[in-house]
Structure formats: C-alpha cells, structure tokens
Amino acid sequence: MSRFFANGSDSESESSEEEVPTQFNNKAQNFQFSDDEEEVKRVVRSTKEKRYENLTSIIKTIRNHKKIKDIPNTLSSFEDLTRAYTKALPVISKEENGITPRFYIRCLAELEDFINEVWEDREGRKNLSKNNSKSLGTLRQKVRKYIKDFEDDLARFREAPDQESDVDEGEGDVHDSDADRAGDDSDTGFGVGAKMAELPKAAKSSVQPTKIIADDDDSEDSIDWDPDTESETESSEDENMYQNMRERFLKRTTEKEDKDDDKRKDKRKEQKHKVRKRADDDEDGEGWETVVKGNVVEKPKMFEKDAEIDVPLVLAKLIEIMSARGKKRTDRRLQIDLLFELRDISEQHSLGTAVAIKIHFSIISAIFDYNLKISEPMKLEHWALLLEVMQSMMKLLLANPDINMNESIAEEHEEYATAPFYVRGCPLAAVERLDDEFTKLLKECDPHSNDYVSRLKDEVNVVKTIELVVQYFELSGSNNERCRIYLRKIEHLYYKFDPEVLKRKRGEQQPATGAAGATPAAPVQSSVEVMDKLCKFIYAKDDTDRIRTRAILAHIYHHAMHDNWFQARDLVLMSHLQDNIDAADPSTRILYNRMMANLGLCAFRQENIKDAHHCLVDLMVTGKPKELLAQGLLPQRQHERSAEQEKIEKQRQMPFHMHINLELLECVYLVSAMLLEIPYIAAHEFDARRRMISKTFYQQLRSSERQSLVGPPESMREHVVAAAKAMRCGNWQACANFIVNKKMNTKVWDLFYESERVREMLVKFIKEESLRTYLFTYSNVYTSISIPSLSQMYELPLPKVHSIISKMIINEELMASLDDPSETVVMHRSEPSRLQALAMQFVDKVTNLVDVNEKVFDMKQGNFFQRGNMGNRDRGYNRNQNNQGGNWGGQRRDNRSQRNRNQRGHHKQNQQQNQQQQQQQVHTIDEE
C-alpha cells in the first residue's frame, strides 16, 4: 500500500469503500451498454448521396477560397471538383436522366463571374503575387474550356438565377439526408450531440440542477458523475422513446431542423416584403440610391445659389478645377465629373461655342491625366468617353469656322465674347495621344480573344476622328501640322489591302460614277490614290526628315501590297533609304524592315525571284525576323537584356492585326533560294571556290544530307528541302508535289491574294529551273539532246525550251550549239569529265600543300640575313661595345669585314638547301 493511502483519514476510507461498488456498477453498465449490438444504428448510404456529398463539400471549399481570393487553392479545388463530377456522371445519367444538378451549374456560374471580376480589375490584378497571377491565368483558361460543355445549362441558369434564399434552401435539401445520418451515426463524433438535441427539455433540466447543487469541495466528483448520469438518462430515454422497433428507423426532425425551417420561411417572407415595397416605391416615382460604405463626401458646389452665371464666372471655375491637375491629393474622377457638370451648365445658359470647346478640351486633358503611368492603357469607360468628347469637339470646330484653336495662342489673348474667337489648345496633340492610347489598348488585349476584336472595331471611330482633324487643318493649319496629321492618317491606311485596286488595274471593274441621266458624281478614290495625294504633299512640304522617311516607307509598302512592283522599286532606289536607315530611330527602322519584307513578297508574286531573294535575305540571315519586324521577343535572348530594355522593346511591338506571317516570309525566302541555288550548285559542282547564294538554305540542305534516315516531310522547311533534292535530280513533278500540296496550301499559299495564280507561277518556275539543273548535271553524258523530248519531259512549250537553252549558251553556262533543222542541242564536250575535274582538284590541293610546306620550312630555318636591313641590330650593339675601347675606328672596320664574310657564307648555304628541297619535291610529285 502506498504512502498516500496509508496517511489517509477514516472518513476518506469510508467514502472510498462506499464509492467502490458504485464505480464497479457504472463500469458494468457502461460495458453492457456499449457492447449491446441492438443499440448500434447502422446507416446505408446510396451512391448518389455519397457523390453529391463529395460535390457539395468541394463547392463549399471553393466558395471559402473565393471569399479570401485564394486563387491557387481555388484552382486545385476546381480540379478536384471536375474529377468528382466525372466520378458522379454514371449516377447522374442513371438517377437524373443526364440532367446536370442545379447546384453544380450554380457553382460554375459563380466561379465564372468571380474570374471575370478579378480579371477585369486591372489595378487589383497588378497587385497580385506572382503565384496568384499565374494561377489566375491557368484557372481562367481551364474554366473557359470546361464550361463549353455546359453552355446551354448556364444560359438557362442565367436567365433565371437563384436568389440567396433559394441557394440556402437548395443546399439544405442536398444535405437533408446527411443531417439525418449525422444524428443517427454513432461511429462518428457527432452521435452524442445529435442525441442531446433529440432529448426533451425535461431531461436537460434534470441534469442541470445536479451541477448547481454540487459543492465546491466535491467539484471533481460532480464532474466525474455528470457524464454517467447523462448516459443513463439517454439510455432510459431511448428505451422509452423507441418502444416500437419500426419507430427507431423512421426519419425524424430535430428541434434544430425545425428552427432552420422557420428561419427559411422568415427569410422568404422578408424577401417578398422587400420586393413588394420596392414595387410600391417604383410606382410612387421614388428611385433607389446606393449607400456607399464610409463617410459620405458631398460633391462641392459649382456656384452660389443666387450667382449669375456668365462667361468670366465659368472660365474662373474652369481655371480653378484645372489648377488641381497633377497635384498629389487630387481626385481625378471627381475632376472629370465636375468638368462635365460645368459643360452642362454652360450649355444651359448658352455661353457660346468657344466656351464649350474650351471645356471639351479640358475634359480631354483630364481623361488623359487620369492614368498616371503612361505605359499602361486607360480604362475602357474612359476610352469610350474620350472618343465621344473628341468627336464632339471637332464637330463644333468644323461647324464654327470663326473659332481659332491653336497652341500658340497665349491665355491672356484668348477671346470668348466676340468673333473671331481665339481658344488656346492643340487638337493635333490630342488626336496623336488618342491614337497612341488606341495602340496601347490593342497591345494589352489577347490577340486571339473577342476583346481584341471589340477593341479593333473602335478603329473606325479613331479614323473618323483623325479625318475630322484633317478637315480642320486643311481649312486652317500650317504645313507642319498638316504633315503630322497626314502621317497619322497614312499609318492607319498603308497596311490595308484594297482588292478594288487590282480589279481596276486588270479592267475587271470601272471606277464608280453617277447614275445614267444624272449629274456625274465624282469617282470614288482608291486607297492608292489617297496615299499618293497624302505622301506627295509630305514630300513637298515637310521640313523634318523623319516624317518624310516614314511617308516614303509607308508609300512603298502600300504599292507593294497592291502589286505595283516597279513603282515601289523605283521609290526605294531614288530615295536611297538603304544608305541612311541606320541613323533613323527604332520605330522607323522597324517600318523599313516591314517594307522590305512586303516588297520581297510583291517581287515573288510578280515572278521576280532574284529580287525577292535580295529583299528577304537581310531579314532571314540573322535568324530573328520576329524581333526585326517587332512581332515579339525571342525567349532565349531575354537574359541578354535588362528589364528596362525589355519594357521599351515591348512598347515598340506592332499590334497583332498588322503582323506579317513569318512562316509565309520564310517559305518565300527558302523557295526563292532553292530556285536560285540548285541550278547554281549543278553548274559549279566541281568548283572548289564556289560561293553560296543563300547561307540559310545551304545550311538546311547540308543538315538534311547529314541525316542517315530521312522520313517524309512534315514541316514547311522539310518540304522545301525535299523539293530541292528532287530538283537536283531534275525530277520536277516530285519537286512540285512537295511545294504545292494540301498541307503547304493551308499553311502558306492560301494566304496570298489570288493564290491559284501564285501556285501556277510556282509550278512554271519549278519546271524551268529543273530543266536547267538537268542540263547542267547530265551534259557530259549526252552527245546531243532532242529539244522536243525535253519539251515533252518537262511539259513546257517548245519555244520556251528553245529560249532557255539559248540563254544558257549565250551566257556561256552550257557549252553547246543548237541545230535548228534537227531541233537538237549538240554538246561540245569542252567541259572536263568527272575524272578530269577530280584530277584538277587534286592538283590544286597538292599545290596548296607545297606552298604550306615551304612556309613552314622557312620559319624553322630562318631567313634573317636575307632581309634588307642586313643585320642593323648587331651594328648598334657593336658600337656600344667599341665606345668603351680606344681604337674605335679600327675595330669598326675589322668587325665590318668579318660580318661581310659571314653573310656571304650563310647566303651560299641557303641557296644550296633551297635547290635540294626543290629537287626532292619534284621527285615526290613524279612518283605520285
């Protein structure tokens, strides 16, 4: 027995003796109660309930993540949701007849709205962390791809969305069975709580007094006693409540569920009451006003209640509002609202058009000032507002020619009372900034989304605004201002293709004129004519080189796009742009690269293969045409540039709708190189000093030849290389099939206007160059060749074959003569045979080897005394030594004579050695 029990009192021992049987009885009762299998309640859940419970729990998790904007966890939960729904599909198709549950559609709709809300909040999106931003993009793509299968269900749901009370009720219905099971399940930790909820109030009240009566000294005993009492009470209550076995398994409602039902009913009543009240208020004509959280800030009053509104008062108020521009605590949104209110007040009091124009220009400036960062695009609501105000101001200026608006007018010289009116401002600067903002909006959008198409539709309004400014400056404007606005119009016109120009050129369509019997209307100007007019004015009136250079480049681009090859080529040659373009700014150099690319495509369409190759070679040989054309940055070079440089280069990028197809450019370049390089290789097969026409094409060809096993071509480059190999053998049909086929048509040739004509031109050139290659390759085999057989072999007209062979003979490419009576080509055999060509190559290599050996021998033996200085280095050394002696002159003469004797001896030895080497080399050559 331990010390603790030994030192105890009698009362404690008595109490312990009394407590022992009680504890034993309780243990026995507890043991019998827990082991009683009749009391264990087992619940069998259907597969539908399990799957739906899994879906609803994940949906709740997603809602919690959305509330705190935890996007990475939202993404992972969404992936879990899709997997859970895939598992539940068999149950849905069986139980629900394939109809998607409404709570699942509601979750998808809420998730889509959440993503759109976060995505449209540009300022908030910039403040996201890197992980959140990356997860947002991934989540957006996955959700947009996933909900395509539920578009009809989502459309029906959005037509009649659930109210908040319906949402709660729907979720409650889904969990009804779960709540019942939670109350009955004794294996989980919720069994006791559910039973306590089912107990009547009398049972609870019988437990509570025992806790209150207990003394402080016996608190531990009371704590130990209470749970046993509760368990006994529960067991007795269960026995009394479930006298019938059937009642034990019937579904029953707890008091908690009854309270929840009452709450739902109260919510519905309140909502119906609110709807009725809102309808009554609408009938009374009283509108609703949204209460903003926080302190209500009253909008400052414009004028005093009894103030007389006139021009000086409005202008003073305008100066007061605009004086807050650029200050730190200025509310820029409020500033715009105040200016609009001031405009309405001036219109109500008819203060004149000049004041209205001044206020319009101030609104435009305030909208531009709203965005503090110049590199970022403005909000869409401000963009639409800017377009509207800008067009309204220009219409007022055009309707009132007595109003002069110029930035050179000082504020003290402004006139608003009497005509002519003078207003300080520069509409040209405003429209230039408007155009720049439009470009930034396009660059910000995803080029493959509907947002880009929507923004691109605004170009119509931008061009209309520019046209209004052009009309205004044509009436009153300097030459410099007209050149600037003309350049803006040119930059929106030069890259657009007008098919009517080509139809007129071919005579398929006559210029539009008036109807018969009516006065003849002025013919509609084509885009080429408009470009000619604008560019010629700039050529004559511009004082700055930049505007003129950009106008020339745009003019050449437009000519090349409409197949005016000779006009475009003459403009390039006469302007000498290629000599001065290195000194231009980066945007002008980008325009020059775009012009050269389009000029090469034009030359290719006009069958000038050599010119097309010359135009494209500078772009393609660098290996980075994407960067040179400002159509994107190469990822492998990003470590070579700083963040600031990368930001600047991104600002210079061209909008997506102005891009030139890079695969089309590369294909045209490689095909042009093939048509030039393959005949040249065949003509100079044994020339050791053969030059390369196209380095890029030559590398592609060599890399393909190094491969041991070459499969069928898949990419565009592989098609061109396979065609080159076929042409090298003179097989024009295989070459044409590799260049012109279904895959290549889809990738490349269908991108051309009148693509069928381009394909016919390609096949014709392939036939001609294959014929030339065949004659170069096999001329040493034939004694004579029949021209009709060549014509039949290459499916070319007889005069065309005759012309090709005649050109080859005239240019001394083919050593042959034409026999007209027999229509044959007689070979002269002046070219060396293959064995002779190899022997000549061998002789050249041996000669080079001999030269190298002689140089190496001279370096080893030395030829110092054969130089012209004749040992002047030693002369200075001897002079220094002799200065120390007395007989300086005698020693000098003796040294000189000795040196001459030594030189003569060395010279004779070198001559003898050289003669012996030459004799040995002659013997070795004879032996070989």
From Swiss-Prot:
Biased amino acid composition, Polar residues: 22-33
Q: Where is the PCI domain?
A: 656-832
Q: Which family, according to the similarity comment? A: Belongs to the eIF-3 subunit C family.
The alphabetized list of GO BP terms reads:
formation of cytoplasmic translation initiation complex
Q: Composition bias, kind Low complexity: at what positions?
A: 910-921
What does this protein do, in the record's words? Answer: Component of the eukaryotic translation initiation factor 3 (eIF-3) complex, which is involved in protein synthesis of a specialized repertoire of mRNAs and, together with other initiation factors, stimulates binding of mRNA and methionyl-tRNAi to the 40S ribosome. The eIF-3 complex specifically targets and initiates translation of a subset of mRNAs involved in cell proliferation.
Q: Which InterPro entries match?
A: EIF3C (IPR027516), EIF3C_N_dom (IPR008905), PCI_dom (IPR000717), WH_DNA-bd_sf (IPR036390)
The subunit structure is: Component of the eukaryotic translation initiation factor 3 (eIF-3) complex. The eIF-3 complex interacts with pix.
- Report the protein name in the record: Eukaryotic translation initiation factor 3 subunit C
> Could you tell me which PANTHER family the record lists for this protein?
EUKARYOTIC TRANSLATION INITATION FACTOR 3, SUBUNIT 8 EIF3S8 -RELATED (PTHR13937), EUKARYOTIC TRANSLATION INITIATION FACTOR 3 SUBUNIT C-RELATED (PTHR13937:SF0)
The primary gene name is: eIF3c
> Which residue ranges are recorded for the region named Disordered?
1-37, 157-286, 864-928
Q: Which GO terms describe its cellular component?
A: eukaryotic 43S preinitiation complex; eukaryotic 48S preinitiation complex; eukaryotic translation initiation factor 3 complex
Gene Ontology MF: a single term: translation initiation factor activity
Basic residues bias located where? 265-277, 898-909
Record's compositionally biased regions (Basic and acidic residues): 172-184, 245-264
Q: Where is the composition biased (Acidic residues)?
A: 11-20, 162-171, 215-240
Residue numbers carrying Phosphoserine: 34, 165, 177, 186
Q: Please provide the record's keywords in A-Z order.
A: Cytoplasm, Initiation factor, Phosphoprotein, Protein biosynthesis
Q: Could you tell me where this protein is found in the cell?
A: Cytoplasm
**Annotated HAMAP family:** eIF3c (MF_03002)
